[in-house]
């Protein structure tokens, strides 16, 4: 593919087979007149910038992206409300498949469905009202570049499929969730592992009681909501644990409810604004272990509740 592709009103584009980006920046645009579907049924590769736009319609790629020859950058649905489906991987474990990656905008109301096992990119931002992660164990990876789900007004929920253990690794860069993370009510445990030496920012996790273990490592862990873990299935009857390794910064009132699982905080705990943000830890029968100082830098709010410490 060596030229831009633009359709007429509500026109569609279907590319069947592998797509190699030949030269220059490439844009495929079906957004005219509201939008038409944009479908690629093979793999996409080539050292170029790729921009895909489909307006209110769906953009879908069923093959891998950037395996062999990585894309310089990848932009999908940077205007329009339509959803995005990526059924396979971006890159491989050792090599990123794209540079800077932007999927969706604050206007995106369609679901972004990510079915690949690995999304190895440059700095990556995913924005939509809803996300569905359907692979068995999806891994999002960068080399010292940030990964963000939503930004600005977007606060879409990230839904993990049964047994879709989520792992994000960014070296020393930020990991940011501006919306909630939930599991799927299918009776199979789902774990979350977020790892960076930079800042991890989270809202609510496991509000529907379908998340088992939560393990977060960061230079700073910024919390604003409730982390809930649970026993999810009879086949894995272990209570979900919560482990936070790093300095915990209470951006908002924070609750950890582990329903019998152990809670461990390896680091200090401070309020983002001195004396205003509260912390409640309720582990049921599980142990609570806090190894750092509480309020040493900025005092926590009037409520500090540690049940079964």
Regions found by a protein language model. Give the residues of each.
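The right-handed parallel beta-helix/beta-solenoid scaffold, focusing on the short coil/turn
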Residues: 3, 11-13, 17-19, 24-26, ...
């Amino acid at each position: 593919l060596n030229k831009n592709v633009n359709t007429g009103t509500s026109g569609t584009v279907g590319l069947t087979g592998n797509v190699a980006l030949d030269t220059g920046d490439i844009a495929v645009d079906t957004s005219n007149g509201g939008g038409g579907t944009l479908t690629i049924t093979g793999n996409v590769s080539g050292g170029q910038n790729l921009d895909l736009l489909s307006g209110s319609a769906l953009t879908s790629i069923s093959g891998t992206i950037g395996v062999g020859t990585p894309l310089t950058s990848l932009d999908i649905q940077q205007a329009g409300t339509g959803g995005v489906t990526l059924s396979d991987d971006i890159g491989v474990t050792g090599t990123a498949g794209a540079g800077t990656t932007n999927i969706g905008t604050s206007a995106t109301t369609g679901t972004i469905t990510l079915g690949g096992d690995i999304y190895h990119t440059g700095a990556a931002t995913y924005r939509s009202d809803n996300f569905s992660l359907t692979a068995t164990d999806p891994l999002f990876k960068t080399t010292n570049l940030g990964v963000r789900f939503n930004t600005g007004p977007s606060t879409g929920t990230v839904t993990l499929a049964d047994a879709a253990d989520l792992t994000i690794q960014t070296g020393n860069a930020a990991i940011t969730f501006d919306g909630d993370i939930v599991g799927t009510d299918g009776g199979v445990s789902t774990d979350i592992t977020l790892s960076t030496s930079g800042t991890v920012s989270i809202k609510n996790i496991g509000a529907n009681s379908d998340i088992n273990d939560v393990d977060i490592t960061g230079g700073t862990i910024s919390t604003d909501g409730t982390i809930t873990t649970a026993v999810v299935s009879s086949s894995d009857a272990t209570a979900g644990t919560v482990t936070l390794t790093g300095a915990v910064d209470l951006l908002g009132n924070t609750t950890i409810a582990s329903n019998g699982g152990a809670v461990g905080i390896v680091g200090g705990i401070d309020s983002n604004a001195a004396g205003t943000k509260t912390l409640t830890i309720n582990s049921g029968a599980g142990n609570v272990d806090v190894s750092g100082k509480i309020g040493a830098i900025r005092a926590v709010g009037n409520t500090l509740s540690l049940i079964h410490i």
